[in-house]
């Protein structure tokens, strides 16, 4: 995948320690940072599927995980899911 690719990050609502279910981006910060570091433009898109994060490149889902499995906050450099997502985007056609 060329650098500066457009990536659509689709994310669903999730519940956090007694708080109501809603769309939050706190757990996406590391993933956003990793993709931005590679020069990708990331568009956020809310979806209704609970606990889901999907990365789409050229209309194809190249990565999917449970949003609760991503580390809360941070730069994403130590999060293995962020590394996996980065590689999936770089390998996308």
UniProtKB/Swiss-Prot annotation:
Which Pfam families has this protein been placed in?
UPF0728
Which superkingdom does the taxonomy of this entry point to?
A: Eukaryota
Family, according to the entry, reads as follows: Belongs to the UPF0728 family.
Q: What is this protein called?
A: UPF0728 protein C10orf53 homolog
Q: Which organism is it from?
A: Bos taurus
Q: What is the lineage of its organism?
A: Eukaryota, Metazoa, Chordata, Craniata, Vertebrata
């Amino acid at each position: 995948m060329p650098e500066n690719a457009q990536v659509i990050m689709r994310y669903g609502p999730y519940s956090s320690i007694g708080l109501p279910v809603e769309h939050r981006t706190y757990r996406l910060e590391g993933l956003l940072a990793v993709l931005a570091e590679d020069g990708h433009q990331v568009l956020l898109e809310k979806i209704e599927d609970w606990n889901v994060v999907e990365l789409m490149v050229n209309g194809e889902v190249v990565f999917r995980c449970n949003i609760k499995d991503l580390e809360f906050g941070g730069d994403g450099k130590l999060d293995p899911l962020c590394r996996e997502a980065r590689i999936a985007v770089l390998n996308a056609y």
